[in-house]
Curated annotation (Swiss-Prot):
Assembly with partners or alone: Homodimer.
Function: Involved in the heme biosynthesis. Catalyzes the aerobic oxidative decarboxylation of propionate groups of rings A and B of coproporphyrinogen-III to yield the vinyl groups in protoporphyrinogen-IX.
Binding site for substrate: 92, 108-110, 257-259
Protein name: Oxygen-dependent coproporphyrinogen-III oxidase
Keyword match Metal-binding: yes
Leader peptide range in chain numbering: none
Primary location group: cytoplasm
One Pfam family matching this protein: Coprogen_oxidas
Annotated pathway: Porphyrin-containing compound metabolism; protoporphyrin-IX biosynthesis; protoporphyrinogen-IX from coproporphyrinogen-III (O2 route): step 1/1
Name of the gene encoding the protein in the UniProt record: hemF
Length: 299
């Protein structure tokens, strides 16, 4: 089996396993599957869970797409690849819980290959996972980062620190001067050693559930009221702003003629903006700002 097919098979299995785990913890709703084809090449399967007991919306998509020419978002930092043919596969997810005390989360693992005249000119892995709480709890954030550190450990002492820092820098809203959440891991252009890099991608993909599900279990029955729900919807606005203004995956998908429904499944089903909103000093809502600055979470 060639390298691309090995990655593809892993990713489809990962999607299946994550869906099964989410359905089990939700206990009410199930994922609906939408199979799609892309005229320019390839296709995918988008799965959406709606109106569950735990999740307002959980979306997880697998795609295997190709094209005759790289879009600008992919070749901007690799000008030598401009005009190359390409093929990419990946799994991307965003989960929006009902309860404001459960963080929103995002994860992505992907593989990209570019060719010219039938010869591979570049191939690399990318991905990571990050956490966006509205009412953060130190225990949860520390668990998230300790899980990330543990899965990075076999790949060198500097791996966690480097990819945590990359995550903090990538998921940053410059126009708001704040991070999107409390970070996690982010990596791109990892293409020096296929076997080692593929092993790391698998560690990140497999580690996501270990990082997230214990937090869901701890917070899913926490009581909340209208004020907490309103703040959750307001903060979801930051999620929308990041995805539509900065996110490379969103821009790549839209610029490459990707399927808009699948690309934009990351957006929350409900969201609100409020001009000039300021939380009450000393409130739980005001406390969030202290978490939107990169810091060491390992304790």
């Amino acid at each position: 089996m060639n390298e691309f097919d090995r990655v593809r098979d892993y990713l489809t299995d990962l999607q299946d396993r994550i869906c099964a785990a989410v359905e089990a913890i939700d206990g009410k709703a199930r994922f609906a599957e939408d199979l799609w084809q892309r005229a320019e090449g390839g296709g995918g399967r988008t799965r959406i869970l709606r109106d569950g007991a735990v999740f307002e919306q959980a979306g997880i998509g697998f795609s295997d797409v190709s094209g005759a020419r790289l879009p600008p978002s992919a070749s901007a930092h690799r000008p030598e690849l401009a005009g190359a043919t390409w093929r990419a596969c990946g799994v991307s997810l965003v989960f929006h819980p009902h309860n404001p005390h459960i963080p929103t989360t995002h994860a992505n693992v992907r593989y990209f290959r570019a060719e010219r005249d039938g010869e591979m000119v570049a191939a690399w892995f990318g991905g990571g996972f990050d956490l966006t709480p509205f009412y953060p709890v130190d225990e949860d954030v520390m668990h998230w980062h300790r899980t990330a550190q543990a899965l990075c450990a076999p790949f060198g002492e500097e791996r966690y620190a480097a990819h945590k820092r990359w995550c903090d820098e990538y998921f940053f809203l410059r126009h708001r001067n704040e991070t999107r959440g409390v970070g996690g891991l982010f990596f791109d252009d990892l293409g020096q050693d296929f076997e080692r890099d593929f092993a790391y991608q698998r560690a990140v993909g497999d580690g996501f559930l270990d990082a997230y599900l214990p937090i869901v279990e701890r917070r899913k029955d926490t009581p909340y009221g209208e004020a907490e729900r309103a703040f959750q919807l307001y903060r979801r606005g930051r999620y929308v702003e990041f995805n539509l203004v900065y996110d490379r995956g969103t821009l790549f998908g839209l610029q490459s003629g990707g399927r808009a429904e699948s690309i934009l499944m990351s957006l929350p089903p409900q969201v609100r903006w409020e001009y000039g909103f300021q939380p009450q000093p000393g409130s739980a809502e005001a406390r969030l700002a202290d978490y939107l600055i990169p810091r060491d979470w390992l304790g």
